[in-house]
Amino acid sequence: MLQQTLCLIKPDATQRNLIGKIISYLENAGLKIKAIKKLQLTQAQAEKFYLEHQDKPFFASLVGFMISAPIVAIVLEGENAIAHYRELMGATNPEQREAGTIRALYAISNQENSVHGSDSETSAKREIDYFFSKEEIC
């Protein structure tokens, strides 16, 4: 099934000039870029985007990290794009990351793990709509 999903290249990766490497990795894996933008999140934007985590102990540090440097938001498209991209990302936990995944290659820690990806069709729609208008996706 053809799907779209959201990829965020996080501040740790943008600060280390990994944007091009991550985009190449995604395209080489067969995903198409339908929209892309680089932006600096405000605290309010980061808090709203991660609202589902507001009661978790890591919320404040996550928001602080996400506003620490620019991010890149990307709409990816492909067959079963949500699951495919999540496989390419690799596990959040460093000890569970499979070799060759984006996080195995570039992550520094659980939080500084280079990329974010939607975990379901519902979250993909919400997250894509958060960053992109319909006119920006082509």
UniProtKB/Swiss-Prot annotation:
The active site is at 116 (pros-phosphohistidine intermediate). GO terms for molecular function: ATP binding; metal ion binding; nucleoside diphosphate kinase activity. Belongs to the NDK family. ATP binds at residues 10, 58, 86, 92, 103, 113. It is an enzyme of class 2 (transferase). PANTHER family: NUCLEOSIDE DIPHOSPHATE KINASE, NUCLEOSIDE DIPHOSPHATE KINASE DDB_G0292928-RELATED. The keyword Transmembrane helix does not apply. Its EC number is 2.7.4.6. SUPFAM superfamilies: Nucleoside diphosphate kinase, NDK. Major role in the synthesis of nucleoside triphosphates other than ATP. The ATP gamma phosphate is transferred to the NDP beta phosphate via a ping-pong mechanism, using a phosphorylated active-site intermediate. It is found in: Cytoplasm. It catalyses: a 2'-deoxyribonucleoside 5'-diphosphate + ATP = a 2'-deoxyribonucleoside 5'-triphosphate + ADP; a ribonucleoside 5'-diphosphate + ATP = a ribonucleoside 5'-triphosphate + ADP. This is Nucleoside diphosphate kinase. GO terms for cellular component: cytoplasm. GO terms for biological process: CTP biosynthetic process; GTP biosynthetic process; UTP biosynthetic process. Homotetramer. It comes from the Bacteria. The keyword RNA-binding does not apply. Its cofactor is Mg(2+). Pfam families: NDK (PF00334). It comes from Haemophilus ducreyi (strain 35000HP / ATCC 700724). Keywords: ATP-binding, Cytoplasm, Kinase, Magnesium, Metal-binding, Nucleotide metabolism, Nucleotide-binding, Phosphoprotein, Transferase.
